[in-house]
């Protein structure tokens, strides 16, 4: 099973000058938990101890951010980003005290040696430690493997390659991830940025190459051109048969819910357009499908699925109404029969 680490409440902070509020953190963490996200990463964009005049000051402390998220999470694990030098051992101690589950110790891709004491500190407390190699485009595969091996030796349970500049192309990602997968005895992860419009493609290639962890943010909410868009990634992963704890429909619900309390402004693809792509429907049908779903009071995404089964082509708008009406009738019969689905009755 692929682990999804959601950096919306950490990398997303970069996009708004680190101004996430406690209310936003609580609302998103609760929604991500309900959506089945594995790890919810929280904090200043630069991680624990990052709030400063130089890097940008947060309106609330690391303690309050983490306590707020901890209180909202039930099944998702709470994660933090930590850069040695910006953060101190005391910052990790605070995070562990509050109940952080995953500490991601991040260094420049050629400076893994500075991660040792912090990985060891995390493991000694019985928590999960990931190593993160930032700006990974700046080192060739063999050099990255050597650095990752150091993190593995220190006790890291996974190493994540971070394409911090959004520089990488699929061929570069494949070569580097394959090298780490072949050379390590721990899991490999990948964190993409979308500067070249390749974040989802690069993440899929990383998975094909053997990565078991992918990072993403709702609506691509993150630094610069944004991160891998969570909704698009999950849709593409479903198409490719990757197993996760969440589903496309659950992350769609998560993304739409953020419009009331987060509403990221980073460039992203709308949920309805992702659905039309996932199910192979003509893009021009989207407003018609949304209107029909609203008029008949049916689930929009179930309607996409039904229309995909009909293999619609352009010019068949009438079938949208037909299928929406059928879904509404099935719903009414289901209610009348105490929850038995119409398709089950006719099977």
Curated annotation (Swiss-Prot):
Pfam families on file: DmpG_comm, HMGL-like
Lyase as UniProt keyword: yes
Domain Pyruvate carboxyltransferase: 2-252
GO biological process: catabolic process; L-leucine biosynthetic process
Keywords: Aromatic hydrocarbons catabolism, Lyase, Manganese, Metal-binding
Transmembrane region(s): none
PROSITE patterns: PYR_CT (PS50991)
Domain of life according to the entry: Bacteria
One MF annotation (Gene Ontology) recorded for this entry: manganese ion binding
SUPFAM superfamilies hit by this protein: Aldolase, post-HMGL domain-like
Catalytic activity: (S)-4-hydroxy-2-oxopentanoate = acetaldehyde + pyruvate
Positions of Mn(2+) binding: 11, 191, 193
Residues annotated as the enzyme's active site: 14 (proton acceptor)
Enzyme Commission identifier(s): 4.1.3.39
Annotated site location: Transition state stabilizer: 10
Residues involved in substrate binding: 10-11, 164, 191
Family statement: Belongs to the 4-hydroxy-2-oxovalerate aldolase family.
Record-linked PANTHER family: 2-ISOPROPYLMALATE SYNTHASE 1, CHLOROPLASTIC-RELATED, HOMOCITRATE SYNTHASE-RELATED
Name of protein: 4-hydroxy-2-oxovalerate aldolase
Organism of origin: Burkholderia pseudomallei (strain K96243)
Gene: mhpE
């Amino acid at each position: 099973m692929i682990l999804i680490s959601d950096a919306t409440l950490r990398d997303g902070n970069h996009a708004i000058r680190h101004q996430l509020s406690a209310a936003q953190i609580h609302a998103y963490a609760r929604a991500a938990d309900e959506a089945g996200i594995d790890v919810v990463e929280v904090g200043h964009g630069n991680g624990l101890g990052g709030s400063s005049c130089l890097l940008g000051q947060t309106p609330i402390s690391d303690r309050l951010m983490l306590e707020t998220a901890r209180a909202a999470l039930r099944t998702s694990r709470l994660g933090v980003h930590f850069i040695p030098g910006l953060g101190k051992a005391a910052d990790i101690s605070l995070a562990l005290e509050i109940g952080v589950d995953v500490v991601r110790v991040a260094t420049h891709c050629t400076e893994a040696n500075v991660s040792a004491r912090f990985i060891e500190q995390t493991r000694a407390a019985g928590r999960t430690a990931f190593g993160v190699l930032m700006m990974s485009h700046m080192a060739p595969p063999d050099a990255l493997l050597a650095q990752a091996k150091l993190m593995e030796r220190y006790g890291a349970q996974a190493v994540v390659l971070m394409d911090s500049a959004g520089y990488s192309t699929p061929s570069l990602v494949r070569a580097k991830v394959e090298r780490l997968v072949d050379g390590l005895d721990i899991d490999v992860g990948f964190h993409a940025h979308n500067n070249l419009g390749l974040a989802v493609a690069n993440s899929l290639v990383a998975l094909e190459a053997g990565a078991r962890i992918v990072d993403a943010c709702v609506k691509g909410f993150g630094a610069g051109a944004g991160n891998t868009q969570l909704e698009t990634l999950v849709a593409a992963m479903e198409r490719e048969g990757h197993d996760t704890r969440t589903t496309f429909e659950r992350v769609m619900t998560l993304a739409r819910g953020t419009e009331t309390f987060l509403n990221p402004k980073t460039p992203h693809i709308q949920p309805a357009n992702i659905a039309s792509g996932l199910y192979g429907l003509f893009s021009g049908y989207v407003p018609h499908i949304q209107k029909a779903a609203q008029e008949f009071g049916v689930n929009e995404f179930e309607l996409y699925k039904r229309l995909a089964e009909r293999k619609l082509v352009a010019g068949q708008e009438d079938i949208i109404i037909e299928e929406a009406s059928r879904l509404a009738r099935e719903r009414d019969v289901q209610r009348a029969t105490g929850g038995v689905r119409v398709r089950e009755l006719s099977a």
